[in-house]
Amino acid sequence: MASELVPVSASVVSTGLGIRYVGDYCYAYSGEHDVSNSEITLLEDTTGSGLIRGHAQFGYGEPTGEDFRYLIYFNDLIVLNQVASGTTDTPIGPMFYALIIPPFTKVKLTAENLSSSNAREHTALLTGRVYGV
């Protein structure tokens, strides 16, 4: 069965907590969120019936010298715990992680400022190909 194409006039680009599906692909873009010294959810949703082979990425573009923790959860279990140490000279580069996400999995991406209570803008994205739908 061939996937239906999304018409050019359709608006499929948006931000928010959820995963969106277009044909055999999925994506989620968090938009910018202020991250301070408590864990902030950037993306959260439960996947559908297909397996997702994809990538997650965290972004932060303001050089402040602060340290941040990025977490990826599957069904409330931590599958990735990354601490990025900042410098005042260069921003923390994009952190890019390959993922295989099983069907019907609750996925959550979070960030936390470990060095300061100052709020800093962060983004997260999840993109992938969906198999077995």
Describe each PLM feature range.
Residues 1-133:
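Beta-strand-centric surfaces of beta-sandwich/beta-rich domains
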